[in-house]
């Protein structure tokens, strides 16, 4: 009579693509938390360490823009600032599954999940180079960190394809993605070019879908 058990979890990998929309939350434009108005896309890789968690790496590129004239805030409408910026980010962290999601098991499988870690990004600095009466100017490069806070839902579409939808906010350590705090660019205070709320940093949000392909080691069995 033979007995057998699985003595290790299938440490399977995933690679794929993410696409969706981005929006900015700061001192220029609308203040909606989730309102995608520009594109974002890139690559995602995961190393599933157990049915409940995975190491995750993503490389994403996005455009962000904001326009005071589209804001519901009368003061911003009267001010009339606007900008366009780009963000290239690398993010590394842990993805936690609410329910067990074992890629070695048969379908159907699905679970909500959370992701967080550390993000390093590149964007343009902006500032009111020609004074408050003029618009924001892109000048210089802003390298900084952010904390990603992501909620999503994923499902095994086939034995080797995983589909997911997610919303992820990035709290940045910068207050100058919108040009409101040019000290980060100039290394000096410039009161005539400062505006907005100094007590809050900038955020950006990615909303989209991903499709990943799985591969890797199946469970080992003892007889």
Language model regions located:
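Short glycine/proline- and aromatic-enriched beta-strand/turn motifs that initiate or cap beta-hairpins
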Residues: 8-48, 125, 206-219
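Extracellular loop and loop/strand-boundary signature of outer-membrane beta-barrel proteins
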Residues: 25-31, 75-83, 133-139, 194-197
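Gram-negative (and chloroplast) outer-membrane scaffold detector with strong preference
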Residues: 53-130, 213-215
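Residues on the lipid-exposed face of transmembrane beta-strands in outer-membrane beta-barrel proteins
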Residues: 17, 43-47, 92-96, 116-120, ...
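Flexible, surface-exposed loop regions and adjacent strand-edge segments
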Residues: 32-36, 71-78, 130-135, 180-189
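Repeated loop/turn-to-beta-strand initiation elements of outer-membrane beta-barrel proteins
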Residues: 13, 52-55, 102, 159-163, ...
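Residues that define the transmembrane beta-barrel architecture of outer-membrane proteins
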Residues: 11, 35-39, 86-90, 110, ...
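Predominantly the C-terminal beta-signal and adjacent terminal strand-loop region
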Residues: 69, 157-223
């Amino acid at each position: 009579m033979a007995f057998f058990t699985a003595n290790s979890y299938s440490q399977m990998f995933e690679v794929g693509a993410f696409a969706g929309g981005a929006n900015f939350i700061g001192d220029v434009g609308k203040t909606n938390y989730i309102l995608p108005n520009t594109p974002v896309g890139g690559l995602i890789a995961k190393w599933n360490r157990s049915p409940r968690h995975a190491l995750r790496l993503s490389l994403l590129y996005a455009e962000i823009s904001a326009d005071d004239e589209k804001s519901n805030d009368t003061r911003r409408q009267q001010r009339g600032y606007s900008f366009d910026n780009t963000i290239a980010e690398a993010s590394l962290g842990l993805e936690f599954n609410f329910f067990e999601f074992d890629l070695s098991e048969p379908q159907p499988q699905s679970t909500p999940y959370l992701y967080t870690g550390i993000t390093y990004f590149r964007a343009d600095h902006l500032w009111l180079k020609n004074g408050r009466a003029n618009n924001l100017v892109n000048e210089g490069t802003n390298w900084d960190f952010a904390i990603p806070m992501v909620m999503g839902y994923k499902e095994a579409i086939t034995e080797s394809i995983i589909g997911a939808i997610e919303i992820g906010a990035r709290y940045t350590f910068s207050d100058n993605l919108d040009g409101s705090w040019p000290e980060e660019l100039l290394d000096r205070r410039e009161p005539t070019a400062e505006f907005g709320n100094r007590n809050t940093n900038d955020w950006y949000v990615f909303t989209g879908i991903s499709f990943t392909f799985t591969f890797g080691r199946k469970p080992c069995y003892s007889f």
